[in-house]
């Protein structure tokens, strides 16, 4: 084992005092002065009582005892002598034998040294703090002599001892203190010997202290528990990375981090489905830093993170900076809005990680010709938003410039079909991690559906918000003015507490409903796809801070924002797909909270509601089945109508607001047209759901409205529904009822024959309703009733066939026999129906009796059926799935297959994983889908775009399509200015090509105003330097240079005008003109001679 270096302890002041330290000497002096002053005061004050003096003396004695205790426990460094000459340099006082009596006196002081307290700098304190936690195994490198070191000094590192050991050491300390207090008044030599013996005994006890088997088992169990915790410590991360994670306060990884980080470290390509706020940023940042390690001197970017927006890129940049503390990794941010020159300098410094938006990164790749061939790790953060914002061309172009050995990670909340195609093309055998719980509705979520006409939706929406969600408290009506003010205040407070989001189909509905709610006194905000990003951010901040309780939104806008936990959701337009409904409702009833999802269902949307319940496996009722049942029952969802009086009241308010508000009046027609286009692009429901929707009873009130209804309202509704369902038996031919009318007599004879057929058909429909659990009574499906129902269906089918045959044949005798048979069968049918309506015990008895009769018939009366009944066999094949008895049937698939599939990791991307949200405008819908002649179906236009055309045109960070040509203007100017360049990939890092380190700039200096701020600061520094140094700055601004140029040009013009000859105006020649100009006149000798 390696021994520590020799520790030399010197006397700092070289004092000759052996038994007293400097601190003790100073304390003694202070005590002497205090005692002298008190003695003087006591002489002067002779009137003091004896009791006061006694108290003072007691206090003095107690204080002296405390000082003696401190002196016995604390040994100051001045007490230590200089090291003796006989000690070797390679030995320390830890290795000496203190059990020798001759060395007792020499090393008595040394044995009681507290290393961390006796010196100005802690010798081992810093080192011990570094080895906290799981790194205590490194302490084995240091070999200490256990006989000398007092183990109580290492109590700070409690992780390496058990709780029983700590109790043992505490007992030893208390024993030492008690012994020292007893021997405080004794001589110094005796006290020193006793303390030395106690220390030796404690050390011997510690050496001979055996570890019990129970303690060993406890240690094993605690170590196993630590390993099974599933924290970041079990992921084999580096020391600096683990310290940075724990420093941020992250102790336990989230589910997406727990499943994705080990797979990313293994090198798999991953598609992770998780919404914002689930910890997906840490899921790809932590393994990235683990894999990259430290800065590489060879030139080349090794990791790229692409974000859809500037704000998200800045957020990930901060996370990477926090997690990369302690490493020398170089991370840069490349987003739109910052200056290109500063980003050129960042790229020239050989960064390891680039966090960028696709538009600006593509601009740099075209400008500088930079290569990404060394990239090992690329992340597409919020991939569905990247494709929604139109970055498809940039992403495919960036992928084409990467190496094939890269690791690609893609994180998204949904998987549109366009994104699935991108995954199949760009990723290598990716693993799908789908931990999004949107595939499952919470048990605390209650579903309510209101069936109504489409024109009544606006009125019902106001009724839900005013009277159900934000219900005003009932107050006494003595003072009308006070009650109105208190109701408004309470309504606003409830809106702030509970948050509600309204989903609509188009952006025009968003604007219309927002204006209508504002005029109704309900504060709201709105977000749609065409809203400005700044306005979207402001509106979302209002909703998240609970300044506003209602937000109107479309599906696409809700996909791109981080919506907090909600209390209520209203589906104004029912979603055409089940997963879109689950996506909308996913924020409600989370984290143990309860919530309600309200849906306004028009008649054409009822089949979609049935498809949803088939997907969820829930039954839906229009009344309570038993007493005490509430709407919060997780097994059922409830539907029903709203009283017409309430609907009329609210729709009247809406009509009045349309007439008064010009904006609502102008948006009314646009809403109508937008809804028509939405219906044309909406996918259709299943045929079975359309058939079942016609059989539903949509006449009863919703069970939630029991508090808002009276008994008279229910009676009125029943009467109105009976009027609606009334169908007179007379036909058009029987309107003119006369005695000798032939038509009337024919219809009477026909009715006598076909009444039984009509009744049997009605019974058949009734049985189908009860079997599909959509009848008026909404009975639960019971497998014990299945046989009787089948018999009834077969009987009614036989009846109809026989009646039709009898009508074709005109034999009266056969008709009479058939009628008798039908009457007997009808009686049997009536008996069976009564049996169904009786109690379950009677039904079971009847079933047992019928089964016994059938068994007896099968035993003795064996018949061979003919193969003529093909129709009956076909019907039996169709209804084969409904004849399963759950007591005996064993399915090939497990019951929780859907849940396990939703929470599993797979390599396949099926249609079940895809979620294509409906666009909020017709223009987006037309752009997204194009007819493909070869495939014979509609295909996404962006996925089927030509690669050649996409390379020619690239969308820049401003959102405009620009030709993908290399323009080196900005880059060349930067190279001339800084005398640097971006090195090629694979070169060794060279500092001469890198520009000087840029100065730190705060966040407010980013963007366009940065250069202006720098110039203003330079000008202010120049003005200040003139007064200090006594001379002005020699640097000139652009304005000064242009001013000097204009002044110079003006002077040149003045000089030219002064040099023009005046004699040139005369008729004389050039020479005469010259002389004339000299003398200032046009007359000269030359001129005279020429005349």
From Swiss-Prot:
Residues 26-35, 196-207, 814-823, 865-874, 944-975, 1008-1019, 1031-1052 have a biased composition (Basic and acidic residues). It comes from Dictyostelium discoideum. InterPro entries: DBP10_C, DDX54/DBP10_DEAD-box_helicase, DEAD/DEAH_box_helicase_dom, DEAD_box_RNA_helicase, Helicase_ATP-bd, Helicase_C-like, P-loop_NTPase, RNA-helicase_DEAD-box_CS. This is ATP-dependent RNA helicase ddx54. Residues 1-63, 150-231, 801-896, 933-1091 are annotated as: Disordered. Belongs to the DEAD box helicase family. DDX54/DBP10 subfamily. Residues 478-632 form the Helicase C-terminal domain. The gene is helA. It is found in: Nucleus, Nucleolus. It catalyses: ATP + H2O = ADP + phosphate + H(+). GO terms for cellular component: nucleolus. GO terms for molecular function: ATP binding; ATP hydrolysis activity; RNA binding; RNA helicase activity. A motif (Q motif) lies at residues 230-258.
């Amino acid at each position: 084992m390696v021994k520590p270096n020799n520790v030399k302890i010197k006397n700092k002041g070289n004092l000759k005092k052996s038994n007293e330290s400097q601190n003790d000497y100073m304390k003694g002096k202070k005590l002497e002065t205090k005692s002298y002053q008190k003695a003087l005061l006591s002489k002067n004050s002779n009137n003091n009582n004896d009791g006061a003096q006694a108290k003072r003396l007691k206090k003095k004695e107690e204080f002296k005892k405390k000082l003696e205790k401190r002196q016995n426990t604390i040994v100051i460094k001045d007490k230590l002598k200089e090291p003796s000459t006989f000690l070797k340099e390679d030995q320390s006082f830890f290795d000496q034998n203190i059990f020798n009596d001759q060395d007792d006196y020499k090393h008595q002081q040394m044995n009681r040294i507290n290393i961390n307290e006796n010196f100005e700098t802690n010798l081992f304190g810093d080192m011990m703090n570094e080895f906290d936690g799981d790194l205590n195994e490194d302490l084995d490198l240091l070999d200490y002599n256990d006989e000398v070191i007092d183990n109580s000094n290492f109590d700070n590192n409690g992780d390496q001892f058990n709780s029983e050991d700590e109790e043992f050491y505490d007992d030893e300390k208390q024993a030492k203190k008690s012994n020292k207090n007893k021997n405080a008044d004794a001589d110094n030599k005796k006290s020193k010997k006793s303390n030395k013996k106690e220390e030796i005994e404690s050390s011997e006890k510690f050496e001979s202290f055996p570890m019990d088997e129970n303690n060993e088992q406890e240690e094993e169990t605690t170590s196993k528990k630590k390993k099974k915790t599933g924290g970041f410590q079990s992921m084999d991360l580096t020391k600096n990375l683990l310290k940075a994670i724990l420093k941020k306060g992250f102790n336990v990884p989230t589910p997406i981090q727990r499943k994705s980080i080990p797979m990313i470290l293994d090198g798999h390509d991953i598609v992770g489905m998780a919404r914002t706020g689930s910890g997906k940023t840490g899921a790809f940042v932590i393994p990235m830093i683990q894999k990259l390690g430290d800065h590489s001197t060879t030139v080349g970017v090794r990791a790229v993170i692409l974000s859809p927006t500037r704000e998200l890129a800045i957020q990930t940049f901060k996370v990477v900076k926090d997690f990369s503390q302690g490493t020398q990794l170089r991370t840069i941010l490349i987003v739109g809005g910052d200056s290109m020159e500063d980003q050129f300098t960042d790229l020239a410094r050989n960064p390891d990680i680039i966090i960028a938006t696709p538009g600006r990164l593509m601009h740099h790749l075209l400008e500088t010709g930079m290569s990404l061939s060394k990239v090992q790790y690329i992340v597409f953060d919020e991939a569905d938003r990247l494709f929604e914002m139109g970055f498809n061309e940039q992403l495919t172009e960036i992928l084409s410039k990467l190496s094939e050995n890269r690791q690609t990670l893609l994180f998204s909340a949904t998987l549109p079909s366009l994104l699935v195609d991108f995954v199949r093309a760009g990723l290598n055998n990716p693993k799908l991690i789908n931990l999004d719980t949107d595939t499952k509705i919470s048990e605390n979520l209650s579903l309510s559906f209101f069936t109504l006409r489409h024109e009544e939706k606006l009125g019902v929406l106001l009724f839900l918000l005013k009277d159900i969600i934000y219900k005003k408290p009932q107050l006494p009506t003595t003072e009308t003015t006070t009650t109105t003010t208190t109701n408004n205040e309470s309504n606003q407070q409830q809106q702030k507490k509970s948050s509600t989001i309204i989903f609509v189909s188009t952006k025009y509905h968003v604007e219309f409903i927002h204006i209508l709610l504002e005029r109704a006194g309900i504060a709201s905000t709105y977000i749609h796809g065409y809203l400005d990003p700044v306005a979207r951010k402001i509106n979302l901040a209002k909703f998240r801070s609970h300044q506003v309780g209602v937000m109107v939104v479309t599906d696409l806008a809700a996909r791109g924002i981080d919506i907090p936990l909600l209390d209520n959701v209203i589906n104004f337009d029912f979603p055409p797909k089940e997963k879109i409904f689950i996506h909308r409702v996913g924020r409600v009833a989370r984290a143990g909270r309860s919530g309600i999802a309200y849906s306004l269902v028009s008649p054409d949307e009822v089949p979609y509601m049935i498809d949803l319940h088939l997907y969820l496996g829930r039954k839906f009722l229009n009344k309570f089945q038993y007493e005490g049942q509430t709407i919060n029952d997780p097994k059922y969802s409830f539907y029903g109508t709203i009283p017409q009086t309430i609907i009329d009241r609210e729709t009247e308010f809406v009509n009045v607001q349309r007439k008064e508000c010009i904006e609502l009046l102008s948006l009314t027609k646009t809403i109508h047209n937008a809804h028509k286009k939405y219906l044309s692009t909406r996918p259709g429901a299943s045929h079975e759901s359309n058939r079942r929707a016609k059989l539903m009873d949509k006449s009863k009130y919703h069970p939630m409205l029991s508090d808002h209804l009276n008994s008279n309202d229910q009676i009125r509704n029943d009467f109105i529904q009976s009027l609606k369902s009334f169908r007179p038996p007379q036909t058009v031919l029987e309107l003119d009822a006369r005695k000798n009318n032939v038509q009337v007599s024919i219809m009477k004879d026909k009715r006598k024959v076909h009444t039984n057929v009509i009744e049997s058909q009605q019974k058949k429909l009734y049985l189908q309703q009860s079997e599909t659990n959509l009848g008026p009574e909404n009975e639960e499906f019971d497998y014990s009733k299945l046989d009787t129902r089948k018999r009834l269906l077969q009987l009614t089918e036989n009846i109809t066939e026989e009646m039709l045959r009898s009508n074709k044949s005109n034999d009266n005798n056969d008709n009479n026999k058939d009628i008798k048979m039908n009457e007997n069968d009808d009686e049997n049918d009536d008996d069976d129906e009564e049996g169904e309506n009786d109690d379950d015990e009677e039904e079971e008895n009847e079933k047992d009796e019928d089964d016994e009769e059938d068994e007896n018939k099968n035993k003795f009366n064996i018949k061979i059926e003919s193969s003529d009944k093909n129709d009956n066999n076909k019907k039996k094949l169709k209804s084969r799935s409904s004849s399963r008895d759950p007591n005996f049937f064993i399915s090939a698939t497990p019951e929780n297959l859907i849940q396990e599939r939703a929470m599993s990791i797979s390599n396949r991307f099926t249609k079940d994983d895809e979620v294509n949200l409906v666009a909020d405008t017709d223009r987006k819908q037309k752009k997204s889908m194009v007819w493909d002649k070869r495939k014979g179906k509609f295909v996404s236009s962006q996925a089927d775009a030509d690669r050649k055309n996409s390379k020619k045109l690239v969308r820049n960070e401003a959102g405009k399509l620009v030709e993908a040509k290399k323009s080196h203007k900005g880059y060349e100017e930067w190279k001339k200015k800084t005398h640097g360049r971006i090195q090629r990939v694979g070169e060794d890092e060279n500092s001469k090509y890198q520009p000087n380190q840029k100065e730190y700039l705060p966040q407010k200096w980013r963007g366009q105003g940065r250069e202006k701020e720098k110039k203003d600061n330079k000008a202010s520094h120049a003005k200040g330097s003139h007064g200090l140094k006594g001379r002005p700055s020699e640097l000139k601004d652009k304005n000064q240079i242009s001013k000097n140029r204009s002044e110079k040009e003006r002077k040149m013009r003045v000089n030219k005008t002064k040099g023009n000859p005046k004699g040139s105006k005369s008729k004389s020649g050039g020479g005469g003109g010259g002389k004339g100009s000299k003398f200032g006149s046009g007359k000269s000798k030359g001129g005279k001679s020429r005349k």
